[in-house]
Swiss-Prot record:
Protein name: Calpain-like protease palB/RIM13
Pfam annotation, one family: Peptidase_C2
Zinc recorded as keyword: no
PANTHER family: CALPAIN-7
Protein's organism: Cryptococcus neoformans var. neoformans serotype D (strain JEC21 / ATCC MYA-565) (Filobasidiella neoformans)
Active site as annotated: 185, 354
Function: Required for the proteolytic cleavage of the transcription factor RIM101 in response to alkaline ambient pH.
Transmembrane parts of this sequence: none
MF-aspect GO terms: calcium-dependent cysteine-type endopeptidase activity; cysteine-type endopeptidase activity
UniProt record similarity statement: Belongs to the peptidase C2 family. PalB/RIM13 subfamily.
Keyword entries, A-Z: Hydrolase, Protease, Thiol protease
Highest taxon of the lineage: Eukaryota
Domain Calpain catalytic: start-end pairs: 118-400
Length: 814
């Protein structure tokens, strides 16, 4: 919304604001029996339009300095009014329009609420004017909280000597960081990495963020002691205002802050280049003080430079050869910064839970070497193999030009008490659709990166456990799964992390794709703002939009994977024991096509999957590809999701499963559609009956094989005793998947324990993964022998389940 002049922009914004007020004021003329919702729904988007107009005006350079606060106040007023109108609509049972303008208005509100961190106001970034450091000396009433080590040194706050500004930013030569008595090693490691990178590749770390600046864009001494630091905080570049006072020891004048010196530095009392301690003061101010224990260097580099952060665990599932190659190639182009983190257990010479910076990496013959910087000590070298063994995490920051195309969205998660009493918190997860289009389909498919960031408000409030789930539709050419999500086993690691940034690198499978992005959080107890950034190479275009939380018809059901029902993935013989549901899709209005959506939210440590099957609402014992209508794809921790573009009116069976047998947990399942749907549980096999489970083993002596083999009577026998007539059913299966054909036959017990009359058999020997079943049958009271056998005298374990509508006993007798 570009404006030619300040007056034009102010008039547009004011007119929209007045129109919104007049629309809302018309409520007073409504009949007492008329609903206020339609009028409020008209007023809401007009308020948002007014807020957008004020926002565009503020982001321009048209507003005179003297009017900025007035325009900001009007902007806040219309936003606050919009929030109140939206809240009123929802209280009355209505919904605000799902138009893009509403999303934009909500995003503006999210960024505005994120402007207070640890009690420090951090307004959205605007380049400061040339005279902001003129006038009376600027001194803040409260200085950042000091760390215990600083307090022990009898601190005082005083200004930097003017001649210190002769030591300018480290753009050439060798500069070193000295941490000093500061608790946070991560930001010092980040700054050390940035300075070394600047010396090698000419990047500008930190000093371009500090104002005022001279004609060359370098920080200079403030005339009145007021500085402004530019940091990327809570989804946007923001201003941190600070004064020029720094802590020194009264005893010996030693600086009680991190310093940056030409190597080697001369005296312990030397301040070095003043931009570094001042930039760090601004950082510590907004993060709660010098006593901050630290996070990780990649988050700090992201705040100062906007380089994309990535954390890679060096233990489970780490591919060291692949990562070295990727990292080394980017390093030599100046496209990556590297840092490291230790865990709670370290070898001698390393500090636990400590951050280290990598200032150089190289190959010497067959050796791969890293030069590592310790903020609290000195530098040392390690081989790549040593690093992978000794450190817990690899932190990378990627130059934004590597992924120049971006799309960004902001939103807020409500705190649980704000949800309706019958709401499932998982269903409140905001969903986005990322449309990806490669300009040259013939080229090799690239990755897209998606960064989930949670906004911080206080150092005393713990971060949420967050995850980002990415699902890709297979597209119209995959007729088997009707556009269901691509399936490929199990997620490599649990995606939940207790961090403020989480990067997912997603390998595209087609030039044009629609990715469904579902951020989720676990145990979140507060309203929290979040930002979602998508990144792609120059050859790929992106669009990111929020999608509706629900389709018109929704059915929800809660369930539980228990020790008895958790059967694992379809490769396990026990998959049939998983919870199954009858799903009925009824015809919609007219001849319109029906689409659907499956969403499951479960415990975050369990990998989940849901399949919709042509099962006619009956139990499905074994899956085949032609039965699958829709599939949520790879087993994913905490969530399962898929869109179903085409859904026929019919009766289906739906199966919920975890990856491994015995993985238990509660879940909430939602089935949405554009036509009426219903979902009800299907009773498990043998439900409501007495049950006995017999575990046995075919040994060299007892593997008798099939009847025609001559040794059939050597097979194990399970004696079943019925005290009165009963209906029974039984199933024999192998505990692990195996191509061994098996059979179960039931005999009357003859005199002396011999096999008597054959009553029922499961038929031809079968290697079906779910085993073989006798089905339901009626038997008189008496003693019976059940004989499990394999076709080829195979040795190994077997499991026999027997159900009866009367009490029974069953045990191996031979």
């Amino acid at each position: 919304m570009p404006f030619c002049s300040y007056q034009e922009g102010l008039k547009v914004a004011s007119d929209l604001g007045n129109k919104a007020i007049q629309t809302e004021a018309s409520l007073s003329s409504l009949s007492p029996v008329a609903s206020p919702i339609p009028t409020l729904q008209k007023a809401f988007p007009i308020y948002i339009s007014a807020a957008e107009a004020y926002g565009h005006l503020l982001s321009s350079k048209l507003v005179p300095q003297s009017d900025i606060e007035t325009v900001k106040r009007k902007w806040r007023l219309v936003l606050e009014r919009a929030e109140k109108v939206k809240s009123r609509i929802e209280q009355l049972g209505g919904h605000v329009a799902k138009a893009e303008i509403g999303d934009r208005g909500e995003e503006i509100a999210v960024l505005r609420r994120a402007s207070l961190i640890n009690g420090v106001a951090v307004e959205l970034w605007r380049p400061p004017g040339d005279t902001f450091d003129a006038g009376e000396p600027y001194r803040e009433a409260v200085q950042p909280e000091l760390a215990a080590a600083q307090l022990d040194m009898d601190p005082e706050w005083r200004d930097i000597q003017a001649d210190c500004w002769l030591h300018q930013a480290p753009n050439e030569g060798d500069w070193v960081m000295r941490q000093g008595p500061v608790s946070d090693c991560s930001v010092v490691a980040a700054m050390g990495v940035g300075i070394k990178h600047a010396g090698q590749f000419g990047t500008a770390f930190g000093w371009e963020n500090l104002y005022p600046q001279d004609a060359h864009g370098r920080p200079r001494r403030s005339k009145n002691g007021k500085h402004i630091l530019k940091l990327l905080l809570n989804g946007a570049w923001r201003s941190v205002v600070l004064d020029s006072l720094l802590p020194f020891s009264k005893r010996d004048k030693t600086p009680l802050f991190t310093t940056c010196h030409p190597a080697p530095h001369i005296l312990p009392t030397s301040v070095g280049s003043p931009w570094a301690p001042l930039a760090l003061k601004g950082y510590f101010k907004v993060h709660g003080g010098y006593s901050l224990r630290g996070s990780n260097p990649s988050s700090d580099i992201y705040e100062f430079m906007g380089w994309i952060p990535e954390r890679i665990g060096l233990k489970e599932g780490f591919q060291r050869e692949k990562e070295w190659k990727r990292m080394k190639e980017a390093w030599h182009k100046g496209n990556v910064m590297v840092s490291l983190g230790t865990g709670s257990k370290v070898s001698e010479g390393l500090v636990k839970l400590h951050a280290y910076g990598v200032i150089r990496l190289r190959e010497e013959g067959h050796e791969r070497i890293l030069d590592i910087f310790d903020p609290g000590a000195t530098s040392f070298t390690m081989s790549w193999d040593q690093v992978c063994a000794e450190f817990e995490a690899l932190h990378l920051n990627w130059k934004p030009s590597v992924m120049p195309n971006t799309a960004t969205r902001h939103w807020s998660w409500p705190k649980p008490p704000d949800l309706p009493s019958d709401a499932d918190p998982g269903m409140m997860n905001t969903r986005y659709r990322l449309h990806v289009n490669a300009s040259s389909p013939s080229s090799s498919l690239s990755e897209v990166w998606i960064l989930l960031s949670q906004h911080i408000t206080s150092r005393d409030r713990p971060l949420d456990d967050i995850a980002l789930h990415v699902f890709e539709g297979l597209g119209p050419n995959n007729s088997r799964n009707l556009g269901a999500i691509y399936s490929e086993g199990l997620e490599r690691t649990n995606p939940y992390t207790n961090s403020n940034h989480l990067l997912v690198r997603y390998q595209l499978r087609r030039p044009t794709s629609d990715l469904t992005l579902i951020p989720s959080r676990d145990r979140g107890i507060d309203q929290t703002g979040f930002t979602l950034n998508a990144f792609a190479p120059a050859s790929i275009s992106l669009s990111l939009e929020r999608i509706s939380r629900t389709l018109p018809f929704t059915q929800r059901i809660s369930g539980n994977l228990t020790d008895r029902s958790a059967g694992g993935h379809p490769g396990w013989p026990t998959h049939m024991t998983n919870p199954q549901y009858k799903v009925v899709v009824r015809p919609g209005e007219g001849k319109s096509e029906i689409s659907g959506r499956i969403i499951l939210h479960g415990e975050k440590d369990v990998p989940w999957n849901v399949k919709l099957i042509w099962g006619r609402g009956q139990l499905v014992y074994e899956l085949s590809e032609d039965l699958i209508v829709a599939d949520t794809g790879s087993y994913s921790y905490g969530i399962a999701y898929c869109d179903i573009p085409e859904l026929q009116p019919d009766t289906y069976t739906l199966i919920v499963s975890a990856f491994e047998p015995g993985q238990t947990g509660l879940f909430s399942l939602s089935l949405e559609a554009t036509a009426p749907v219903s979902i009800i549980p299907i009773a498990a096999e043998g439900a409501g009956m007495y049950n006995r489970v017999v575990n046995g083993f075919w040994t060299e002596r007892t593997a008798g094989g099939r009847p025609s083999g001559g040794t059939y009577e050597s097979n194990p026998r399970v004696e079943m005793v019925l005290s009165k007539p009963a209906t029974i059913q039984s199933r024999l299966y192998l505990p692990t998947r195996s191509p061994v054909p098996i059979n179960l036959t039931i005999f009357k017990r003859a005199q002396g324990g011999a096999l008597g009359e054959q009553l029922v058999t499961t038929g031809p020997y079968s290697d079906s993964i779910c085993g073989v079943s006798t089905g339901k049958m009626k038997l008189d009271s008496g003693v019976y022998l059940l004989v499990p056998s394999s076709y080829e005298k195979s040795k190994g374990g077997w499991v026999l389940k027997i159900w009866s509508d009367v009490a029974l006993s069953a045990e191996i007798v031979g």
